[in-house]
């Protein structure tokens, strides 16, 4: 995607700035860009499975080297937050690799500038989606896991429930043993 977009963008406007984005746990293109040659990573670790590659394509690397002005990385946590934002605020499902550009925006200092952020792909299974939403809610302090040791007598759990209700809290799941 970066090869085609950057090549076309530079053909249309040679002065345009094109920045590539990779997951921090799979930054083979960034390393290759820095080294000036195709570089293989020892391993990759990212939730962005569509971009989780150890070695960039040798055929596309010359175009990337020529047409990208920079390559930055984003952490998986930033992808999780971007996914939650897209679902809640824009009602869009975009796979983790397709959200790299959205997650990168906060690193670029582009306020009051014209920016195009390309979103691609919606290939995400529901189990992964559920996990990403859950993690996003945790990162935003919207859900918590709490363990409480209560005396074994009537009314104790009701007191905890009332305390939560007093602060507009809700119980999603309760385990008792």
Residues of each region from the PLM?
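Short glycine/serine/threonine-rich phosphate/pyrophosphate-binding segments
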Residues: 1-6, 26-30, 97-105, 118, ...
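Short, well-ordered alpha-helices that flank and scaffold nucleotide-derived cofactor binding pockets
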Residues: 7-11, 31, 106-107, 162
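Small/polar-residue-rich loop-to-helix segments that shape phosphate-bearing ligand pockets
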Residues: 9, 13-17, 22-79, 91
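Residues at the starts of beta-strands that form the adenosine-phosphate
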Residues: 15-17, 114, 170
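Active-site loop ensemble at the mouth of alpha/beta enzyme cores that anchors a bound cofactor
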Residues: 41, 61, 110-112, 118, ...
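Active-site-adjacent helical/loop segments in soluble small-molecule enzymes
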Residues: 57-113, 172
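A conserved regulatory-domain signal marking ACT and ACT-like small-molecule sensing domains
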Residues: 129-177
């Amino acid at each position: 995607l970066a090869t085609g977009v950057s090549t076309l963008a530079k053909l249309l406007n040679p002065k345009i700035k094109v920045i590539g984005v990779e997951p921090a746990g799979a930054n083979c293109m960034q390393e290759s860009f820095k080294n000036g040659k195709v570089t293989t990573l020892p391993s990759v670790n990212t939730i962005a499975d569509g971009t989780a590659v150890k070695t960039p394509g040798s055929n596309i690397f010359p175009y990337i080297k020529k047409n990208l002005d920079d390559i930055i990385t984003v952490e998986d946590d930033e992808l999780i937050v971007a996914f939650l934002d897209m679902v809640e605020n824009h009602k869009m499902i975009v796979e983790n690799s397709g959200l790299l550009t959205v997650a990168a925006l906060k690193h670029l200092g582009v306020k009051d500038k014209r920016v195009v952020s390309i979103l691609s792909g919606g290939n995400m299974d529901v189990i992964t989606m559920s996990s990403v939403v859950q993690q996003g809610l945790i990162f935003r302090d919207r859900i918590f896991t709490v363990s409480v040791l209560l005396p074994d007598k009537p009314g104790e759990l009701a007191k905890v429930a009332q305390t939560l209700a007093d602060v507009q809290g809700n119980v999603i799941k309760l385990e008792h043993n």
